[in-house]
């Protein structure tokens, strides 16, 4: 008869070394969502690429929007709050993208004090056309499905706090650069 020092219960934790290495780091998840919102959900960038607008303000808006979303997600980058906050950011940016696309609003309206967020939303009538629902599904729904099916690496409390604080400072800097550039282009 042999002596067993450890008993196996058949239960495997998410914190096993192999699974922890395969899971996505929360910082990379923030970068992926911020990049998606800044590039794919930026209607101004796509309008500029097809020749309907200026490219430099669209790029500045991409940098500023990605930085703002990254900052927001770094603040809410904790284990229980990240996915709901990222869902809100993805669906909200898809809705705003539909409004910008259907109303052809210039990117400099982001730094205009007179512009309200409600002016960027799509009109109610456009919600029943084909463009806005398709944009909501492609730009918001599919990334939300990816997000909720992606395992994120569980970090210890101090490591998660360091990651969040580093992300807050980095993304604040990125947003400041993007919106400062957009403000200079709007003033010129």
Each language-model region and where it sits:
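Transmembrane and membrane-interface helices of multi-pass
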Residues: 2-187
């Amino acid at each position: 008869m042999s002596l067993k020092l450890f008993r196996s219960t058949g239960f495997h934790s998410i914190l096993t070394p192999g699974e922890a290495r395969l899971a996505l780091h929360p910082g990379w998840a923030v970068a992926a969502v911020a990049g998606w919102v800044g590039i794919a959900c930026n209607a101004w960038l796509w309008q500029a690429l097809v020749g309907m607008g200026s490219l430099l303000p669209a790029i500045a808006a991409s940098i500023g929007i990605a930085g703002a979303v990254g900052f927001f997600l770094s603040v809410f980058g904790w284990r229980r709050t990240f996915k709901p906050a990222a869902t809100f950011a993805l669906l909200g940016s898809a809705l705003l993208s539909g409004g910008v696309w259907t109303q052809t609003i210039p990117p400099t309206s982001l730094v205009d004090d007179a512009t309200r967020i409600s002016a960027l939303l799509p009109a109610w009538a456009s919600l029943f056309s084909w463009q806005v629902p398709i944009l909501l599904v492609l730009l918001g729904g599919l990334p939300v499905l990816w997000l909720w099916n992606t395992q994120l690496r569980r970090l210890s409390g101090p490591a998660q706090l360091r990651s969040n604080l580093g992300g807050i400072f980095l993304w604040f800097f990125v947003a400041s650069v993007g919106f400062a550039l957009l403000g200079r282009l709007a003033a010129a």
